[in-house]
């Protein structure tokens, strides 16, 4: 009953994001479609289907672009990454997993476009806390790749200074 008392007296509770693997796969596929409609997904959902034995199929196109990691430290690529995050946040979508392996850059003749993958933690209708967490995570990722000055400068160029530094 001491445990019961602690459970009952908590100020808030975070429910599991997904109740089943099927829901998790569906969520990932649907977020890929929504983010793809904004032009910043690095793959396109091809199929999403429930299968026998409780399995779920999620098929997508091959990933577009080159993974953003320490080997792609060309500072001209940092601005497109922050621009892509601003697109998500402009539609109140948080990514939730902005590590370098989930970000690719598609370099064209005239420009570069940053694209996102790995939407298992993405949220539609994200709270301000989740949006701020994205900014913090992307600051860590872009600082590790491009350096602190370039990362912060690009972040402030897309978002206002108060948003980035708060």
Question: What is the predicted role of each segment?
Answer:
Residues 25-42, 66-101:
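Conserved kinase catalytic-core helix
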Residues 47, 105-107:
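Conserved hydrophobic "DFG−1" position in protein kinase catalytic cores
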Residues 17-19, 71-72, 125:
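Short, contiguous strand/loop micro-motifs
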Residues 108-166:
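C-lobe/activation-segment region of protein kinase-like
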Residues 1-58, 90:
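Conserved ATP-binding subdomain of kinase catalytic cores across diverse folds
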Residues 64-68, 122-123:
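A short, flexible beta-alpha/helix-coil linker loop
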Residues 61:
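Conserved Hanks-type protein kinase catalytic core
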Residues 54-57, 102, 111-113:
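A generic structural signal for beta-strand entry/edge sites
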């Amino acid at each position: 009953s001491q445990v019961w008392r602690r459970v009952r007296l908590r100020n808030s509770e975070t429910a599991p994001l997904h109740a089943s693997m099927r829901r998790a796969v569906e969520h990932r596929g649907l977020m890929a479609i929504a983010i793809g409609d904004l032009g910043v997904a690095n793959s396109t959902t091809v199929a999403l289907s429930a299968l026998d034995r409780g399995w779920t199929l999620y098929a997508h196109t091959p990933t577009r672009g080159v993974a953003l990691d320490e080997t792609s430290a060309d500072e001209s690529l940092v601005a497109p990454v922050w621009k892509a995050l601003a697109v998500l946040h402009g539609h109140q979508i948080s990514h939730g997993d902005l590590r370098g392996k989930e970000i690719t850059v598609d370099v064209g003749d005239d420009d570069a476009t940053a694209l996102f993958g790995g939407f298992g933690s993405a949220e539609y209708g994200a709270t301000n806390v989740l949006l701020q967490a994205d900014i913090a995570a992307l600051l860590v990722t872009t600082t590790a790749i491009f350096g602190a000055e370039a990362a912060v400068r690009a972040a402030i160029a897309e978002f206002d200074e108060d948003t980035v530094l708060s």
